[in-house]
Amino acid sequence: MFKNDFQINQAAQHYLPNGLKVIHYLDASNPLICIQLHIKVGSAKENDYCRGYSHFIEHLTFKSTVNYPQNLISEIVPKNGGSINAYTDFDSTCYYLMMPSEKLELSLKILSELAFRACFTPADVKIEKDIIIEEIKQYENDPEGDFGEYIQQQYFRTSPLKYPVLGTVKSVSKAGYKDLLQHYKTNYVPSNAFVTISGSYYEEELLLYMDRYFGPWMDSEGAFQYQIQDKTEEVSNFRMDYRYRKGSTDYLGITLPELAESHPYSDHLLIAIRALAIGKSSRLYRRLVEKEKICASIKVSSLCGVLPGVSIIMFNPIGKGHIRQIIEVFAQELYHLLHHDMEAAELELIKRDLINGWIYSFESMENTASAISAEEFAGDTYKLYNYDKTIEAIKLEEIRLSIINYWKAESLQIYYQSSDNKEWKSVESITVQDFVAPILNAKIKKRAISLKQIEDYANSVEHIPASPNSITRISESYYTLQLTNSLRVTYKHIPNKIYCGFAIASPVSQIMETGHNRGVNYLTTSAMLYGSKYHTYPQIQDISRQHGFNLRVIHHLDTTIFKGKCFIDDLPVALNILSEILLYPTFDNRYISHIKSSTMDNLRREDDYPVTYAFKLWQKMLCGTKTNLDNSSGSISQLKSLRQGDLRKWHESWNFPTQFNLSIVGSISPEEIYSITQKCFGSVPLNDYPPTLHQPMYQSSPKQLRQVKKNIGQAIINLGGFAGPASDVKQNTAFHILAQVIGGDLFSRMFKILREQYGFAYQTGFDFNSINSVGFWNSFVYCDPKDVKPSLKLLQGILKDICENGITADELLTAQNYLIGMNRFDSENVSWQASSIANLIALGYDLDHFLSREERIRNVTLSDIFTTANNWLLPEKHYIHILS
């Protein structure tokens, strides 16, 4: 099946006798289900008496239900190999559950409990109140997120979208048990909800269980009746606004009106904003990030939904002195869009982006359910099933008229956040007229876009037959291929999929670097994406967008992976581009400079984010300052010192034939995979170099406890240490299970004790990472500064208890089932599968190691866990850092 043959079957709809709408979409490709319960209440439907209550209820429902008291849901779901979570936005509260399909009945029972059998207590309210206040503080400590929320509150005047979803410290503090219970009973009713199911199921069985568990749910007296609110666009006035934030690097935000999702011209403005500001192909990105190099990044946030809202274009300036220039470039590019500047070729590529994204959204159960639910809110599911036709029908003149009608200069708002206002004084004189008639830069030439397709290797060259010994079948679905130049290809065949995942991995990585060339692997492999001997970077962008594939590089400590995803009919084109950038990169100095400047700005901004800053300080305690185990890019000074010649020299290490592994996952025959890969890679002469030498560098601090005070209003505790190497497979597997028990998902000890029992922490977690020679672990707690001592004591108590008494059989089983379940969910993603296989084989493992993951997890015993804990978690091995 090819992408041009792609058709989406319509989801079925059913109403229970109580009025609850059930939407179900059958996809039997994997034995999984995703179920989403949507309650049509979010922050946009709250008033001044209940700000943040919808989000508050989302927290409280998990605390206790009739059949699952004491947070039992958070244990039952992972024990059955599933995952459950929830979110609240402007329009709804959504509870979403991923489970093996054989757990359908249990899944529906659990969601029904959340829907109408929650029985939280005043004590629960008190604990969650403290947690939500910490969550609000966490957002306030994010300079970019906090700035976005400030713009949200200033931009809207009458729209309920101006209020934060979490509420405020004041509104949450005053929330009482009775008011919250009333909010739950009033809004959590079948007439104000719907359920979406995507995955593998039998319809008769599904409807039987829906009626059994959701049938008793009834509207209460005075129940909320959902109504579509006024969708009139809010008229804003031109505004220039400066906001002071102590210690903040600079951020610039410019707003543009956004139409409600159900508006007939919402897609027209979506195309316009993509042309202007979304992605690396947008005009603003190419001007400000790539050409002028005065912005590190440009992001667009959408504050919209059922109601019309706003798009916030967020600019991260590099250094000082560029704010006026950024605003002028924005004015120029907006002016060009208004004056017939978009040509058919540019529009065609944006349409391809949108349509390809729509097709990819059906790759996983969760994405499919989310897409169906979004259209249910918009009130027009027809659009979901015919999105390609809707997008193809949009005309250039319609887009221009939409821009003229809705992106008026007099409604623009410009916001600037900084720790000083010196630069703001240079732009305060800007008026509406500067956007109506901006000074245009005659030197800026419009980039030509060619839709001429790359040579189709599948059709222009004869099929290359495989020799008798070049394809070996390993199992029912897996094959190994040997190309004529000895390059190894691993292939997994999955039937009836239009998607292909591919990845090529090498153990050439940052732990081959020394103090003299830190960051060279990151910079080299990042620059390889920016043009080849045969295609410039803009041409590669256009080709990938036209054919609907993407290429990216992933930097692990011990491997580097180039990975991507495409449609099966475009695999020859995608692999040809991949082979070009790997073997014949140009290392254009313009793009090297762009990567360096953007990366260095991001490194500078890291210290603005307390969570990132705290982890860096902890990692320095563990590994020292002269290490190659921290971030892949190295430091700012190390990046500055690297030159084009350094990159070319490092690239020579990428010509190791025995180090490469190309992995592909798709529905093409193994013989055709051989033919395609032989064309793209098989004719390249490769040299037989010696094995890669990994040299991890680290020197721990003699001080194992450090406290830093920055008055951030929160405390961040990092506690961790070294762990066993990945080469000890048995212990490594045991540590992954141990990590889940201590601080993994909602069933972990850290979550249950620090968050649920005592309410000290808004967020807890436990991370574990390892390479062949060393591993390290890190646990973290975000809490109020006054709770640092009891939080640290509880965390140390958890670790001490496990070292002395081990874990329970129930904890072991839950963690095993959870890890196996998550692996199955991840396997829906063909790109993830390909990169996982390539990564392991590049490190010297065979395919059996990948295939036996579940068996290794099942074989871990309580004794293995106890031994592992006592090897690495004892108090004398802890490195503790506290930032407050």
Task: Pin down the residues of each PLM region.
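Histidine-acidic residue clusters that define the catalytic metal-binding segment
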Residues: 2-13, 154-193, 205, 225-231, ...
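Short alpha-helical functional segments enriched in proximate histidine and acidic residues
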Residues: 60, 114, 118, 139, ...
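Short, conserved secondary-structure transition motifs
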Residues: 133-139, 229-244, 350-362, 566-567, ...
